[in-house]
A protein has these predicted regions:
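An N-terminal, well-structured beta->alpha segment
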Residues: 1-63, 67-68, 143-167
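Residue-level signal for pocket-adjacent positions within structured domains
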Residues: 1-9, 105-107, 115, 139
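Glycine-rich loops and low-complexity Gly/Arg-rich segments
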Residues: 30-32, 69-72, 97-100, 120-124, ...
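Short C-terminal domain-edge/linker segments immediately following a structured domain
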Residues: 37-38, 75-78, 126-132
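Ferredoxin-reductase
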Residues: 39-116
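Gly/Ser/Thr-enriched, mixed-charge loops and adjacent short helices
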Residues: 108-167
């Protein structure tokens, strides 16, 4: 695993030279184990953006998380704000979004949270990196359920615009 993928605010690199399905699976195994051991959590949300590599990366990420014994709520293809909204609506406080944000189309990666709804940063990312490199992952059989937050998100946004128009 190329250690340069662990950055200040996320895990990101060029696909498939730095980030590939094997890396996604390992990140999933690590994340599922990490949230159980360090955060006492057994469920997380997962979303993905529209990059061509995102579906296969999300599939392997989810497989890794569930094989660590965690349950996953799969939000499918969503924007990052929809992913965060999905976490709120599904009542999960942590998760991973498969995205490279504003980076070039050949990049991909993972934005993740560890202690609240929001991106891990700094020491949180580096602690997760150390945990991942140690490789002491839990094993289990988590379940996957699907939740589509898009209609809820659109309604939420529409209400905001209606209220704004009334002011």
């Amino acid at each position: 695993m190329d250690l340069k993928i662990f950055r200040e605010y996320d895990i990101r690199g060029e696909y498939p030279t730095q980030i590939d399905e094997e890396v996604a699976y390992t990140i999933g195994r690590s994340y599922g184990s990490y949230i159980q051991e360090k955060l006492n959590r057994k469920i997380c949300g997962v979303g993905r953006d529209n990059r061509l590599s995102s579906p296969s990366l999300a599939k392997e990420l989810i497989r890794g998380i569930t094989e660590s014994g965690c349950d996953v709520i799969d939000f499918g293809l969503v924007t990052t704000p929809m992913y965060f909204f999905g976490c709120l609506k599904a009542n999960v406080i942590i998760g991973i979004m498969v995205t490279a944000s504003h980076n070039p189309k050949d990049d991909n990666g993972f934005k993740f949270s560890v202690d609240h709804l929001g991106n891990a940063r700094g020491k949180q990312v580096y602690d997760f990196k150390d945990y991942t490199l140690a490789g002491n992952f839990l094993s289990g059989n988590g379940n996957v359920s699907e939740f589509d937050p898009r209609d809820y998100y659109k309604s939420f946004i529409n209400i905001r615009f209606i209220i704004y128009d009334l002011i």
